[in-house]
Amino acid sequence: MLSVNEALSYDKDAIGIGRKGTIDKPYILKAPFWTVDTLFYAIPREKVDLNFAFDIFQNIDWKKKDESTGVPSLSKTAINNIYVLAPKFEEQQVLGRFFSRIDNLITLHQRKQKQKSPPITASLVIYGSICFDCFMSVSNTS
């Protein structure tokens, strides 16, 4: 793929999933969106809620669908051979909104935690080094 001049979708959001490498990390593509040759995308059909479908994508063990010998890789055939049962559209919408809100809440709390927390790993390394140096000097004198 040398260049992309037009969006793949101007008005419908989709679910993106890596074709190579990060095959187990689906995410929502907001319209308009463009893609690259190492990404599959799925625009939900009528009567399929995007957030509900996204929840399904997140719960599929994509690594079991891996068709590679090196870098994790998916094919359209592997994706198209997945069948799931789904409730009525109205129920999908309720469930999709519910899980979307939970995902947003988790993300918000993770961001807050990162802002509040001092870099613990850096202080552990420093204290570990100090204690280790003291321990070594004690053991050398015995």
Predicted regions and their residues:
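Feature detects amphipathic, helix-rich regulatory segments
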Residues: 1-142
